[in-house]
Amino acid sequence: MFPKNAWYVACTPDEIADKPLGRQICNEKIVFYRGPEGRVAAVEDFCPHRGAPLSLGFVRDGKLICGYHGLEMGCEGKTLAMPGQRVQGFPCIKSYAVEERYGFIWVWPGDRELADPALIHHLEWADNPEWAYGGGLYHIACDYRLMIDNLMDLTHETYVHASSIGQKEIDEAPVSTRVEGDTVITSRYMDNVMAPPFWRAALRGNGLADDVPVDRWQICRFAPPSHVLIEVGVAHAGKGGYDAPAEYKAGSIVVDFITPESDTSIWYFWGMARNFRPQGTELTETIRVGQGKIFAEDLDMLEQQQRNLLAYPERQLLKLNIDAGGVQSRRVIDRILAAEQEAADAALIARSAS
């Protein structure tokens, strides 16, 4: 269903600032907290004493304390102490590889021995003072692949987002899709069009005229396990489009980290990074609020689509040219899942033979 030997965004640092956070990821119930020296830790959200969720407890001196009977858990899933009880021999619970990077907490739900922090996608905008970022989190009741489909085919903007970023020229512009290794790239360019409301506001935010024709671009990049980063923007027409000098354009990166909760639900970490007026905190908040409203327009569509697909599992869906980005992304996911299954089967055979 979803790759497990991969890094997913689990939460943001503020979510574990003062208490543990319980969150299901890839069908695994996990509790995140800050252990010794403030390092992020993640273990199974299950107390080995009576099965209570450890996320309902608290943290004391870097130890996770069960809120039911006070059992103390260490970062590696080992029981450390319990009031009035010797704990030697208590079974360990599963612990997870976690990393704090780029303003997010990342988790590896699979085999922690395979977890290499170097595999976390490099996010240039997150460590660069010339960029600003604002975002949020939505919980959506849909298969994570439906969200990938949605983001890799922005034709829907014309209809779902008609009052903000949609325009008829999106339908009319040709789409190009290519695959580079495990990365899928879908591109669309619209020349000499009028900017829709969201982008008129962005032009004004960058001190540019918003009532003149623009060249607009959308470059969607899928990377496994389920990340989609989209370069978007507008430039005054005839100034070079995507390659226009900064003084003629407003561009940004739409950030989409899609973390499966279950087979039919996701944690959707959304945001926008921009490299114009990065010190403008009010502009960052204005864009964040506007983008949040845009993404909220997708929620009902995706959730009702999921309900339809569950109700009619035998129905065959059409595949159109505009679906190429999503189709290719699913093929990448399928290859990774097949490789994980092959490795798991080989490991099982090896254990059986020993």
UniProtKB/Swiss-Prot annotation:
Domain of life: Bacteria
One Pfam family it belongs to: VanA_C
Domain Rieske: from-to ranges: 7-107
EC number(s) per entry: 1.14.13.82
A GO molecular-function annotation: vanillate monooxygenase activity
EC class name: oxidoreductase
Cofactor section: [2Fe-2S] cluster; Fe cation
Binding site for [2Fe-2S] cluster: 47, 49, 66, 69
Protein name: Vanillate O-demethylase oxygenase subunit
Organism annotation: Pseudomonas sp. (strain HR199 / DSM 7063)
Lineage: Bacteria, Pseudomonadati, Pseudomonadota, Gammaproteobacteria, Pseudomonadales
